[in-house]
Amino acid sequence: MGRSKKKGPYVDRKLLEKIRKLNETGEKKVIKTWSRASMIIPEMVGHTIAVYNGMKHIPVYITENMIGHRLGEFAPTRRFGGHADKKAKKGELKK
């Protein structure tokens, strides 16, 4: 179930303050955040936000297509190590 339209999008208060300050000054610098649940709003377009994935901050450049999505969608938290090698499995079965 999605968030009520009456409430509006959730954006971390401190993140929003930093974005607005950068928009006023016209600066373009990377903003670090741990708020993966924050929704991307039009004010963020053109900025680079470093989203924490549990191990490190992943830089995400915000474009117009991303509006309405969450920041966490663009910073994957899991690494795929690959499937087991078939040759290694056959060797184990013979023993």
From Swiss-Prot:
Any single GO BP term: ribosomal small subunit assembly
GO molecular function, one term: rRNA binding
Annotated keywords: Ribonucleoprotein, Ribosomal protein, RNA-binding, rRNA-binding
Keyword rRNA-binding set for record: yes
Gene3D superfamilies cross-referenced by the UniProt entry: 30s Ribosomal Protein S19, Chain A
Biased segments, Basic and acidic residues type: 82-95
Top-rank taxon, per record: Bacteria
Cross-referenced InterPro entries: Ribosomal_uS19 (IPR002222), Ribosomal_uS19_bac-type (IPR005732), Ribosomal_uS19_CS (IPR020934), Ribosomal_uS19_SF (IPR023575)
Residues covered by region (Disordered): 76-95
GO cellular component, one term: small ribosomal subunit
Pfam family name, one: Ribosomal_S19
Stated family: Belongs to the universal ribosomal protein uS19 family.
Entry function: Protein S19 forms a complex with S13 that binds strongly to the 16S ribosomal RNA.
PANTHER family: RIBOSOMAL PROTEIN S19P FAMILY MEMBER, SMALL RIBOSOMAL SUBUNIT PROTEIN US19M
Record's protein name: Small ribosomal subunit protein uS19
